[in-house]
Amino acid sequence: MSIEAPTQAPKPSVTLAEAAGRKAMRRLLPFLLLMYVLAFLDRANIGFAQKALLHDTGLSDAAFAFGAGVFFVGYALFEVPSNLALHRVGARIWMCRIMVTWGLISAAMAWVQSPTSFYVLRFLLGVAEAGFFPGIIYYLTQWFPQSSRARAIGVFYFGAPLAFIFGGPLSGLLLEMHGTFGLAGWKWLFLVEGGLASAVGVWAFWYLVDKPEDARWLSPDERRALTSAIQLDAREAAAHGPRDALAALFDRRVLAYAGIYALIQMSVYGVIFFLPQQVASLMGASVGLKVGLLAAVPWLCAVALTWIVPRRADRLGGHRAWAARLLVMSGVGIAVSGLAGGLGGTAGAIVAMLGLCCAASGFIAAQPLFWTFPARDLAGAASASGIALINSLGGLGGFVAPMLRAAADRNFASHAAGLELLGLASIAAALLILVVAPRAVAPAARSFEPPVRRAR
């Protein structure tokens, strides 16, 4: 006579997988967050250095906009090869390589003397950093199942606002070191922030663990439970998504997500690259510590919303609807910041800052939700190449955004025109998400069983 196992048997494995996931969050996410903070600092520090850099090197506004964007050309060209290399050699080795090389190139920005050297170093910085962001997203899919993935990516995304909360004042202080040891403040900015990236890259080699089954800080049962949960997601993704790295590059869903992400990145970088100067204009001050502190306010709002929304979506579902709402809010906020800033006076400045708070909160909090959509359709090498392609093509939005904003302002003789255009891009992304993204992501209610050992 056979005895059936109780129907509630999977519950302990659910608890075990969740416990292992919480351990992984505590162990990995603070370090990944630090890495992303440094990545964002190295991308956006030219926004703080802009005025002094242009003054000392003679670059024009158009040359600066092109140089700010050419980063994304190198980034896009080498994104997919870089992520496939990470899939092959592991995050520990590849993230070390990425961070050390981009830190050295960022520090070399201190020796920019002409438009040509500016373009070359910005392009090389993109090449060096290629694969960092999609590599981390792919890495998180190897550590966290779908039921907790938005929360994990959401914590990682804190890096963007935190880079401005702490990076704004830090950049302001470094700029005020002008003349120390005979170096201009903007040179100190690149040297210090680039050096920090290289140092953390070396640390990453010793700290990161490639896969749950290699984590000594998890018990054997926890390793099995977490690995089982992730493998279940991978099998489901492989069943209806592209089966290999090459197929993912031509998959219609992947290309559609890349188009959506490009629109999101247009709004993100069209704001980020000019935010310090926009805040300085509202204050009637030059970029420094005070401007850095005020420029941190929108990112404080972004941290709060990014903490709340992905957790709510993982618990209750509705990733698609939340992402669309946040991007509409962001688009309206971007446009309002430009229109109100042109009114002048204290009231106009306050409304413009509120608009920037809505803009930053919306486009930062929406992105962890966005990345759960392609992750449900991709697994293995297809996941590595597909995520890289989305980020690569999407990053081109960051390339064109500064130039589109500058061109719109110039052609319409209005500093609000470019921001209105970027706001429309964010709203268009929201509408496309409603068309392309899956209608629902089930709340975290799945069971994961570790492999069952046969009785001997």
Model regions: which residues?
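Helix-to-loop junctions at the C-terminal end of transmembrane segments
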Residues: 78-91, 304-318, 409
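A late C-terminal transmembrane helix in Major Facilitator Superfamily
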Residues: 377-412
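Glycine-rich segments within core transmembrane alpha-helices of 12-TM secondary carriers
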Residues: 152-175, 196-197, 391-401
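C-terminal transmembrane helical hairpin of 12-TM major facilitator-type secondary transporters
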Residues: 319-373
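Cytoplasmic helix-loop-helix junction between adjacent transmembrane helices
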Residues: 121-158
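Helix-breaking motifs and short loop linkers at transmembrane-helix boundaries and internal kinks
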Residues: 58, 90, 111-117, 128, ...
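Extracytoplasmic gate region of multi-pass secondary transporters
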Residues: 46-47, 248-306, 367, 371
